[in-house]
């Protein structure tokens, strides 16, 4: 019997609530014209899902299944599917985690029609915390052969966000460039590190955990700093780690916000780039005058286009990159165990992706 996992309504103000998870019995969907029916095998959590439970993310829906990231097997084709989709029958695929962004490198072609799926309006039937999902045939990509379903589910949101931040927005995805990734441990930060290493960049990372920094070095980081134990001077410590022939950062990829601009100024080159894909510290970011005088370029970013998604999957397939999995639980009906994954996000415990094996 198919299930969906949604949020259960509860009266409270945004930021003062934590909606419980609710398991629902549903009917198996049928694929419409040019749609493929996928039996989902794994789904992954993102920070946005934690924000949704606190009513801190726009468009919250109590009808829509949770989670944006999923991987499964194509089990049925709707009428009118192309020859390419016919070849996907019985194959494992990963799904795009958004709708309404085709190929424009500057952003969605029509912002009013863009949204990330999972737990939000208007896509009441789209979300990866369910047994079956029917989507347009253009919204899937063949799972790279070297990945399993758990690793495939870990890719969509963090993969496309990291790809766009590093490749499209930073302009520094080149051999020998010095890149800082802040807050290593989350999915986007780790995936950015993996992409940068594969591209020949000198990747530096920061964290408040020495254990996470050690793991990052194992993944290819050439330098690490602890912004908790070295809170007053981690920027100077980082500067001492940079190569003599290129003693500055070319770009910073940041998901925290806060005072990152101020701290990065001492090591960022004139005209350097800071790419911001999130603000977990708070919704406001410092912007000192020194940043303007140094011609620092601050660029916001979010997920990416279908075209970038295809590029990302192809790169992962070519370079045999595997996402890092922090922890998995088995069973969509194991609500208490799934709540434990959300607790890992709340405490910052995870290193890599948190995945439900459906």
Swiss-Prot record:
Keywords: Oxidoreductase
An annotated Gene Ontology molecular function: oxidoreductase activity
Pfam families noted in UniProt: ADH_N, ADH_zinc_N
Highest taxon of the lineage: Eukaryota
Protein's pathway: Secondary metabolite biosynthesis
Catalytic EC class: oxidoreductase
EC number: 1.-.-.-
Expression triggers: Expression is positively regulated by the phomenoic acid biosynthesis cluster-specific transcription regulator C6TF.
Disulfide bonds: none
Function as written in the Swiss-Prot or TrEMBL entry: Zinc-type alcohol dehydrogenase-like protein; part of the gene cluster that mediates the biosynthesis of phomenoic acid, a long chain aliphatic carboxylic acid that does not appear to be essential for pathogenicity but may play a role in allowing to outcompete other fungi in the environmental niche via its antifungal properties. The polyketide synthase produces the long methylated aliphatic carboxylic acid chain of phomenoic acid. The cluster-specific cytochrome P450 monooxygenase may then hydroxylate the methyl group of carbon 31.
Family to which this protein belongs: Belongs to the zinc-containing alcohol dehydrogenase family. Quinone oxidoreductase subfamily.
Protein name: Zinc-type alcohol dehydrogenase-like protein YogA
